[in-house]
Amino acid sequence: MGKFDGVLLVSDFDDTMVDTSSLYRDPQHRLPPVPAYTVERLNYFMDNGGRFCLVTGRSWQIMRPFIDGVPTNGPCAVANGAGIIDISTEQFLYRRFLPADAIDRLKEILARFPDLTCELFRADHRADVIHPIAFTVEHAAGAKYTYRVIEDPRETDAEVIKILFEGENDFLRELEAYIHTRPWFAGYELAFSGLHLLELTAKGANKGEVTKKLMELLGTSPEHLYCAGDQANDLPMLRIGVESFAPANAIPAVLQSGVTVVRSCGEGAVGEVVDLLDRRYA
């Protein structure tokens, strides 16, 4: 029996576990590794009975190249809650993809914003992009994935997990306000995952609901759930933890949400979370 038996710690990946923001300052767009301190502390946590899972906004296509550098002993929740992947088989254990009418909804959005950049992440772990911009190229280079450029969303010939809108923050705020006025929005979720990233998923496909599904799959109790994240899309997850944590680099809305603030992501935020749990379960 380990001191962390029955404890589930879930964490966002980008700018919570790793300093993703730094790759946009690197000419070669290299993502730094998970800090050694975090790796050491997570291994200690798991060696003593704890379960650690990623709950990321990334699709599996974008998470897969980096998963070997993340100490984990559970499934990986992807695409802001649209799915849970068995890391060993790369198969979905749970799916909540966009509804069939999402392509028609996207066409309506594009009619209103004809130059909008969007990435359609597919259930077959591929991506289609409409109107790629420089940020799209940098995003793909940093995340080590390729995409197909299309002109019309109807060219996408697979189920769509999520749609990622890209652009300047002021423009995305205007887009967000427009989508919120649509009568069909009741069937969808919309959340910022970064300053230049706005994500559309199916209703119920959010980090809070997918964390509940992880607890169900792993047989863990809400009384021993701990969460870490830095962005607006992490808030549904952070709200359900017994105690939730945010790195010092988190956005103000997260820092002011009642979380426990730890060191920045690049300094080993999640490692410090384990240290705090070590004291709680002493």
What are these regions (language model features)?
Residues 4-8, 34-35, 199-282:
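Mg2+-dependent phosphoryl-transfer enzymes with acidic/Ser/Thr/Gly-rich catalytic loops
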Residues 6-28, 238:
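Asp-based phosphoryl-transfer active-site loop
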Residues 13, 81, 229-231:
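Active-site metal-binding loops of divalent metal-dependent hydrolases
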Residues 28-50, 95-103, 143-147, 202-216, ...:
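Short, acidic loop-to-helix structural element flanking the phosphoryl-transfer center
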Residues 47-53, 73-74, 162, 223-224, ...:
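Short active-site oxyanion
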Residues 115-228, 232-240, 249:
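Conserved acidic, metal-coordinating active-site core of Asp-based
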